[in-house]
Amino acid sequence: MPFVNIRITKDGVTAEQKKQLIAGVTQLLVDTLGKNPATTVVIIDEVETDNWGIGGESVTERRQQAS
């Protein structure tokens, strides 16, 4: 049973976009590895930008500096 965990920043990703991610990742596993879609699990975790760090800074800080 394949298990895929997708972590993204919480940036207003729509329900439709999440649906497309789940379907697309599932299909990729079917096409590439021959996995059964009925037993493929995809979980999307949305992380607040204050809780996601890159290079010692939160994504929130990095985005503020970039703007």
Curated annotation (Swiss-Prot):
Q: Does the keyword Nuclease apply?
A: no
Against InterPro entries, the record matches this protein to: 4-OT, 4-OT-like_dom, Tautomerase/MIF_sf
Matches recorded under SUPFAM superfamilies: Tautomerase/MIF
| Keyword list, A-Z | Isomerase
- One Pfam family linked to the record: Tautomerase
Enzyme Commission no: 5.3.2.-
- Any idea which residues are catalytic in this one? 2
One example GO MF annotation = isomerase activity
The family assignment reads: Belongs to the 4-oxalocrotonate tautomerase family.
Protein name per the record: Probable tautomerase K2
In its UniProt entry, the species of origin is given as Dickeya dadantii (strain 3937) (Erwinia chrysanthemi (strain 3937))
